[in-house]
C-alpha cells in the first residue's frame, strides 16, 4: 500500500461513525502481532495486524463481520470462500459472483476490495470497489492494460510486481493483478453505504483477455478491508456468493434539455471530481459567491483535479463541449490547461490538450472548448485540470460536459470579481425557504438520528439523495435549510450531522449550534467591503487601495492581566474578539485526546470565555474517559476554527502559562485527519521559560525548524500580541507588531485551521522539563485576527535574524 506517514493523531474518530456503526461490542486486540483465522457459517475469515501496532478489532459472523483499526502499520480483515483444496482453475467453478452490503468508513489510507490468490503460477489479485485518501496501487512500477466494464462499473486493469515479499507460499516474487474502479465507491472521512455485486469470474476473464496469465489454480475469493497507517471501521452486514442483485446493462448518459451530459456546480461537495497525483480536492468557495472546489497539495505540475468520463457516453472520434471555470490567487499569472488522458489502440497512455488559457491573480477564467473531438481509438478517458508551469493551488467551479456547441455552465463576467476565500466573509442572509424546524433535514416533522443519517447520505451520494436525486425521498431545499445547524448559512456538511447527534444526546441544549458570521439574526447587517487597514497609534498611511488607520483601545485587565501589546486590527478579514463574550469563528475541542506527548484530554469546560477573555486551562481530568493507546492524566483546553485559512497575517493577544512541563500556543494546522498533508505553523511559549517564544513549522510532516527568540519580557505577566505572516515564499513571525524572525525554506502550502491550546507534556522532559502536576493553570487570549492581505504593521520587513 501507499507509504504515507501519519504524524499527528486524528482530532477524533467521528461521532457519526461511533453512533451509526456498531451494534455489538467486538473483541479488541491491543498492540499484539495478530493473525487470527477461523471458519463460521461456511465462510473463512482472517484478521491480521502487522508489527504489533495500534488497536484493532474484528467480530466475525456467518457471512458478516465488523472491524476497526487505529494507529496501525498495516491491517486487514477479510471473509470469503477458500477453494485451495480443490486445486482447480477458476473456470471450473462457473460464475463466481460476490454480493456485499457494507458500511465502510475509511479515515486515511485504506481500501475495500475483493481479494485472493492463485497458485501455479503464484498471483495476488485485487478488485477494488472503494478507497480512502489514496487510489491503489499508485503509479510506481505499475503497468496499465486498459479498462473493462463489468456489473455496470468501469475498472482500470493494472499489474504490479512484488519482489521477495511474504505470500501464501512464504517469501516469493509474484505479480499482482488489479481491477480498480475508475470512480471510487467510497469517500474518505465518511461513512459510505455500499451495496453491490462483483462478478469475479468476469474480472478473471477480462484479465486473461488483456494478456495476463490466469492459468493458475484458484486459492480464495474474499471481501477484504485493508488499512495502512490510518484509522477506520467497517460494518460488513452481508457477504454472499449467490448474486442476488439484478444489475441492468449500462446505458449511455442522455443530455438534458440544455445539452449537458454532466454538470457540476459543487453546491453539494466535490461531486465525482477527485485529486490527481498528490493533489487534494475539497469543497470551498466558488465563482460569484457560490460554492466550488479548492485544489491544493500539488507536488508536481501535472497534479490537479480529474474526473473519469463514461465511455458509453463519450465515444472516440465524436465531438463534445468540455470545460470549467478556474481561478488562482497566488501568482501574478499562470496558464491553466484542460487535458484528456486516454489509452490508444496500442495500449499507450496519451495526453491531449483540450484547452489552455492564461489567468491573472484573482481572475476567474473560462477553460472550455465547445468543439473538442476525442481521438480515434481512445479508451480509459480521464479529463483533468493542470497548471503546466506552476504548482500553485487553484479554485474550480461550473465543470461540465455537453454536446458540441453547448455553452459553459458559468458565464464569466468581464468585470473584476473578488477571488473566493476559504475563510468566512459576512454574507447577507440568503433568499429561499425559512426554517420550519431546526434539524429536520428529512422534513418528517421531528428531529432524530434519521436526520443525521439523511445528511450523510446526501453528502456521500448526491446522485441518489441530492436535490435532483433518483431516490423518492431525496434532499429538498427545505431540508437543506432545516439541516444547516452548524455554522448556519454555510450549507450542509458532516458537522451538521454531528451537531444533530450532539443535540440528541444532550451534549448541546438547542439547535442551531452556531451561525456563520453574518447569518445570526440577532446581529446587525455588516458590510462586505474589503478594506486594507494599517493599525498604528499615531499615523495614517494612504496607498493606492482604500487604507484607514484604526486605533483600538483595549479594555484593561481582562482576566486580571494588563494589555501591553499592539491593538487589534478592526478591519481584518476575520475577527474573533473574545472580549465581547462570543467565540467568533472558533469552537472548543471536547472529549478526545491527541496521543503522545499531550498528557491531557481536551474538554470544552477547559476552554471558556469569561471575564473578557478566552481562558484555556490545564486541570485534573474531569471524567473517567479511557483510551487503550494513550490514557492521559489531565484535562486541557483547545479552541479551533471550523474553516480553513491560507496565506495572510495571523495574530492573537495572549498571556501565557508559567510552569515547567506546559505549553501555551497559537498555530495553524492541517493533516491526515483533514485528508491533507501535515502542514503546521507554530507560536509556542514553553512554561519553563516564559521570557522566550519558540517558532516552528512543518511542511508535509517535515519539521526541525525550531527557533527560540528572547522576548525581553515575561509573557506570563501581561497580554502581548504574537503573529505570523504566511506567504508562498516565506513566514515572518511578529511580536508586538515587530518582525523578529523569518524563514524562507520549504514553506507550507496547504490551508489549515487556526488553533490555540494549553497542555502538559509527557515523555518530553528534555524539551519542556517535567510537569509537576500543578493545577489549575490558565492561558488567556483576548482576540484572534486573520488578514488575507498580509501584515500591515509599520515595522514590516525588519529581520534582526538576517
Swiss-Prot record:
Q: Does the keyword Signal apply?
A: yes
Species name for this entry? Answer: Ruminococcus flavefaciens
Ranges where the record places region B: 245-523
- List each copy of the GH16 domain by range: 556-792
Q: What is this protein called?
A: Xylanase/beta-glucanase
Q: Where are the transmembrane segments?
A: none
> Where does the record place the catalytic residues?
124, 226, 684
Query: What are the boundaries of the region Linker?
Result: 524-555
Q: Which UniProt keywords apply?
A: Carbohydrate metabolism, Glycosidase, Hydrolase, Multifunctional enzyme, Polysaccharide degradation, Signal, Xylan degradation
List residues of the GH11 domain.
32-239
Q: Which residue stretches belong to region Disordered? A: 414-436, 533-564
UniProt-listed Enzyme Commission number(s): 3.2.1.8, 3.2.1.73
Query: Which reaction(s) does its UniProt entry say it catalyses?
Result: Endohydrolysis of (1->4)-beta-D-xylosidic linkages in xylans; Hydrolysis of (1->4)-beta-D-glucosidic linkages in beta-D-glucans containing (1->3)- and (1->4)-bonds
Pathway assignment reads:
Glycan degradation; xylan degradation
Amino acid at each position: 500500500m501507499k507509504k504515507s506517514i501519519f504524524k499527528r493523531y486524528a482530532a477524533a474518530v467521528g461521532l457519526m461513525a461511533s453512533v451509526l456503526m456498531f451494534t455489538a461490542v467486538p473483541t479488541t486486540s491491543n498492540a499484539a502481532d495478530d493473525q487470527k483465522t477461523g471458519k463460521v457459517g461456511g465462510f473463512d475469515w482472517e484478521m491480521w495486524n502487522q508489527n504489533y501496532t495500534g488497536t484493532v478489532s474484528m467480530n466475525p459472523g456467518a457471512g458478516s463481520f465488523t472491524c476497526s483499526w487505529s494507529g496501525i502499520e498495516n491491517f486487514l480483515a477479510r471473509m470469503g470462500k477458500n477453494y485451495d483444496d480443490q486445486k482447480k482453475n477458476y473456470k471450473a467453478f462457473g460464475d463466481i459472483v460476490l454480493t456485499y452490503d457494507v458500511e465502510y468508513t475509511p479515515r486515511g489510507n485504506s481500501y475495500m476490495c475483493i481479494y485472493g490468490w492463485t497458485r501455479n503460477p503464484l498471483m495476488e489479485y485485487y478488485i477494488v470497489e472503494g478507497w480512502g485518501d489514496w487510489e491503489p496501487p499508485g503509479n510506481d512500477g505499475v503497468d496499465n492494460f486498459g479498462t473493462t466494464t463489468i456489473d455496470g462499473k468501469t475498472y482500470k486493469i493494472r499489474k504490479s510486481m512484488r519482489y521477495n515479499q511474504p505470500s501464501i507460499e512464504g517469501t516469493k516474487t509474484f505479480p499482482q493483478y488489479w481491477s480498480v474502479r475508475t470512480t471510487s465507491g467510497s469517500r474518505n472521512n465518511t461513512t459510505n453505504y455500499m451495496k453491490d455485486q462483483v462478478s469475479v469470474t468476469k474480472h478473471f476473464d477480462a484479465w486473461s483477455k488483456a494478456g495476463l496469465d490466469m492459468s493458475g489454480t484458484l486459492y480464495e475469493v474474499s471481501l477484504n478491508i485493508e488499512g495502512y497507517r490510518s484509522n477506520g471501521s467497517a460494518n460488513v452486514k452481508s457477504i454472499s456468493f449467490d448474486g442476488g442483485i439484478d444489475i441492468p446493462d449500462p446505458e449511455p448518459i442522455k443530455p438534458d434539455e440544455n445539452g449537458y451530459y454532466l454538470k457540476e456546480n459543487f453546491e453539494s461537495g466535490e461531486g465525482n471530481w477527485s485529486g490527481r497525483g498528490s493533489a487534494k480536492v475539497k469543497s470551498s468557495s466558488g465563482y460569484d459567491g457560490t460554492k466550488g472546489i479548492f485544489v491544493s497539495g500539488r507536488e508536481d505540475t501535472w497534479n490537479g483535479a480529474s474526473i473519469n468520463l463514461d465511455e458509453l457516453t463519450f465515444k472516440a472520434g465524436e465531438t463534445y463541449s468540455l470545460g470549467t471555470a478556474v481561478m488562482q490567487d497566488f501568482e501574478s499569472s499562470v496558464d491553466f490547461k484542460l487535458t484528456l488522458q486516454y489509452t490508444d489502440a496500442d495500449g499507450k497512455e496519451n495526453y491531449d490538450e483540450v484547452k489552455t488559457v492564461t489567468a491573472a491573480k484573482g481572475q476567474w477564467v473560462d477553460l472550455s472548448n465547445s468543439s473538442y473531438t476525442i481521438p480515434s481509438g481512445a479508451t480509459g478517458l480521464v479529463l483533468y485540470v493542470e497548471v503546466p508551469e506552476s504548482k500553485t493551488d487553484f479554485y474550480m467551479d461550473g465543470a461540465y460536459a455537453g454536446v458540441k456547441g453547448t455553452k459553459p455552465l458559468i458565464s464569466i463576467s468581464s468585470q473584476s470579481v473578488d477571488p473566493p476565500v476559504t475563510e468566512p466573509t459576512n454574507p447577507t442572509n440568503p433568499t429561499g425557504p425559512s426554517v420550519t424546524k431546526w434539524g429536520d433535514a428529512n422534513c418528517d416533522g421531528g428531529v432524530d438520528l434519521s436526520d443525521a443519517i439523511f445528511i450523510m447520505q446526501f453528502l456521500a451520494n448526491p446522485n441518489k439523495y441530492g436535490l435532483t436525486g433518483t431516490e423518492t425521498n431525496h434532499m429538498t431545499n427545505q431540508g437543506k435549510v432545516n439541516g444547516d445547524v452548524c455554522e448556519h448559512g454555510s450549507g450542509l456538511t458532516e458537522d451538521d450531522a454531528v451537531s444533530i447527534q450532539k443535540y440528541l444526546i444532550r451534549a448541546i441544549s438547542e439547535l442551531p449550534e452556531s451561525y456563520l458570521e453574518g447569518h445570526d439574526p440577532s446581529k446587525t447587517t455588516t458590510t462586505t467591503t474589503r478594506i486594507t487597514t494599517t493599525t498604528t497609534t499615531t499615523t495614517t498611511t494612504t496607498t493606492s487601495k482604500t487604507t484607514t488607520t484604526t486605533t483600538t483601545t483595549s479594555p484593561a485587565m481582562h482576566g486580571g492581566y494588563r494589555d501591553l501589546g499592539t491593538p487589534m486590527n478592526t478591519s481584518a478579514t476575520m475577527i474573533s474578539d473574545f472580549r465581547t463574550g462570543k467565540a467568533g469563528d472558533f469552537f472548543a475541542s471536547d472529549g478526545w485526546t491527541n496521543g503522545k506527548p499531550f498528557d491531557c484530554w481536551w474538554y470544552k469546560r477547559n476552554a471558556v470565555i469569561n471575564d473578557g477573555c478566552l481562558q484555556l486551562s490545564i486541570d485534573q481530568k474531569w471524567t473517567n474517559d479511557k483510551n487503550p493507546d494513550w490514557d492521559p492524566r489531565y484535562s486541557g483546553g483547545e479552541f479551533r476554527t471550523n474553516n480553513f485559512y491560507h496565506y495572510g497575517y495571523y495574530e492573537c493577544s495572549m498571556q501565557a502559562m508559567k510552569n515547567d512541563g506546559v505549553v501555551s500556543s497559537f498555530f495553524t494546522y492541517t493533516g491526515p485527519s483533514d485528508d491533507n498533508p501535515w502542514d503546521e505553523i507554530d507560536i509556542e511559549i514553553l512554561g519553563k521559560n516564559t521570557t522566550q517564544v519558540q517558532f516552528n513549522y512543518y511542511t508535509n510532516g517535515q519539521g526541525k525548524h525550531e527557533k527560540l527568540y528572547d522576548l525581553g519580557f515575561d509573557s506570563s505577566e501581561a497580554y502581548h500580541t504574537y503573529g505570523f505572516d504566511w506567504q508562498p515564499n516565506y513566514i515572518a513571525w511578529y511580536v508586538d507588531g515587530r518582525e523578529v524572525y523569518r524563514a524562507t525554506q520549504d514553506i507550507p502550502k496547504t490551508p489549515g485551521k487556526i488553533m490555540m491550546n494549553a497542555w502538559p507534556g509527557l515523555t518530553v522532559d528534555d524539551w519542556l522539563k517535567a510537569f509537576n502536576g500543578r493545577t489549575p493553570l490558565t492561558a488567556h487570549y483576548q482576540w484572534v485576527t486573520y488578514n488575507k492581505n498580509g501584515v500591515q504593521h509599520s515595522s514590516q520587513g525588519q529581520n534582526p535574524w538576517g
